[in-house]
Amino acid sequence: MIVIPAIDLKEGKCVRLEQGLMERDTVYSDDPAAQALVWEAKGAELLHIVDLDGAFAGEPKNRGAIEAIVKALKITTQLGGGIRDLATIEAYLGMGIGRVIIGTAAQRNPELVQEACRKFPGRIVVGIDAKNGMVAVQGWAEVTGVTAIDLAKKFEGFGVAAIVYTDISRDGMMKGPNIEATRNLAEAITIPVIASGGVSALRDIENLMAVEAAGISGAITGKAIYSGAIELSEAIALTRRGASC
């Protein structure tokens, strides 16, 4: 399991939201590329980027900041937010993004995921965001009647590289991830699951590592590394020690 730092972009700045609410944001950096370099220097292997404006608008909104991050880094990046069609996927991969995350469009149009996986093998990730176990879309503004597990099962056999699972009630709240829901999802499918939302202390990383065998390949952390609750290099060292045991 690896620890993945997150950069959430709003109006070209690096921010964190509470429970996905755009009005409850905290700006952590006016220079996202410089912030990305900090996380790379601390040992990150993969950077998670979210275009928050894009997620709400349904189209890319922070291309300049994203391109600056990609040009600055040597490590792999994965990007989500506002990716709704093959043309956008192709443009981002051409820019140098390592993997793209399809969220809302995956729920509404699973065929897009299948086609994207066929065209760009190993580079397509599905983002599933859930509130009380039910899938939320459109920048978390709309909760559907579909469970996270039922949606995830639709993508079995497509060649999806991973599923990023976010428990919205935990995101940005520093209350710890929903271990049970994450494990249940990972056990229900063969696709690797990346946990997101709520990681607030090294103990949370340890708790996820304890259920890693269920199929959990990574943990995304945002607010905790910006606030200093977690030292990213320590969290990375912890997972590397676990991998060598």
Swiss-Prot record:
Q: Where is the active site?
A: 8, 129
Is Amino-acid biosynthesis among this UniProt entry's keywords? Answer: yes
Top-tier EC class: isomerase
Alphabetical list of SUPFAM superfamilies matching this protein: Ribulose-phoshate binding barrel (SSF51366)
GO MF, one term, reads: 1-(5-phosphoribosyl)-5-[(5-phosphoribosylamino)methylideneamino]imidazole-4-carboxamide isomerase activity
On whether Metal-binding is a keyword of this UniProt record, the answer is no
What is the reaction catalyzed?
1-(5-phospho-beta-D-ribosyl)-5-[(5-phospho-beta-D-ribosylamino)methylideneamino]imidazole-4-carboxamide = 5-[(5-phospho-1-deoxy-D-ribulos-1-ylimino)methylamino]-1-(5-phospho-beta-D-ribosyl)imidazole-4-carboxamide
One annotated GO biological process: L-tryptophan biosynthetic process
Protein name as it appears in the record? 1-(5-phosphoribosyl)-5-[(5-phosphoribosylamino)methylideneamino] imidazole-4-carboxamide isomerase
Q: Which gene encodes it?
A: hisA
